[in-house]
Regions:
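Short cysteine/histidine-rich zinc-coordinating motifs and their immediately flanking basic loops
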Residues: 31, 199-200
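Residue-level marker of structural boundaries
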Residues: 191, 202-203
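Leloir-type glycosyltransferase catalytic cores
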Residues: 212-214
């Protein structure tokens, strides 16, 4: 792809073997910052598809992939082998560990944490403001925290500050208002525990279950 077809701002480091699609922007300065003020680092083997915008100050590991039109705000830490689907939005100060998969049309706000191997289905919404527009809303922001191997079904909503336990499974369309225990399956609005992941035959041989396996 011709360099004229995308925009790479100053102070951006992209390792070898990257594939960058048309109309991609990398190193976009945050509001009030000058171009190149924050360093942006992307590891080897990245595939960044068309119309994706990556703000400055991100540190991204190896073999990173996006769909089309993903938006990644500033000052995030993203591990190796992470994929972010088309039209998903990652706000600033988010931590995404190795092997996390985020599908299309997902919204992840600032101060969220996704640990190793977490999986987020399409249309999922994380929230981080318990009382939006309240006087101390900005000071009390707290995003959801996904422990390793947590799986979030399509169109689920996670309320601020909830922790989704290791290898837990959140059903499609669930509204999670409380922490989810390790290995639990939750469904509904509000989400409630209905079984354990170890009871689902499809997961019995899943190496991600670790010591939760029977």
């Amino acid at each position: 792809m011709s360099e004229s077809a995308f925009c790479i701002h100053p102070n951006v480091s992209i390792a070898d073997e990257a594939i960058i699609g048309p109309f991609v922007v990398i190193g976009e300065p945050q509001r009030g910052a000058a171009p190149g003020e924050l360093a942006t680092v992307i590891g080897p083997g990245a595939i960044i598809r068309s119309h994706t915008v990556i703000y400055a100050g991100n540190v991204i590991g190896a073999r990173f992939q996006t769909g089309h039109g993903a938006l990644i705000r500033e000052l995030n830490r993203i591990g190796d082998d992470v994929s972010i689907g088309s039209h998903s939005v990652i706000e600033h100060h988010v931590i995404i560990a190795d092997r996390v998969r985020i599908h299309s049309n997902v919204f992840i706000p600032e101060f969220s944490i996704l640990e190793e191997g977490a999986w987020v289905g399409p249309g999922v919404v994380f929230t981080n403001a318990l009382y939006p527009l309240s006087p101390d809303a900005k000071e009390t922001l707290a995003g959801p925290h996904l422990l390793p191997g947590a799986k979030i079904g399509a169109n689920a909503t996670l309320l601020p500050g909830v922790t989704i336990g290791r290898d837990a499974l959140v059903g499609a369309g669930a509204v999670v208002v409380h922490d989810v225990p390790d290995g639990a399956v939750v469904v509904g609005n509000p989400a409630r525990v209905v079984k354990q992941v170890r009871e689902i035959s499809a997961y019995q041989a899943d190496a991600l279950l670790g010591d939760l396996a029977p």
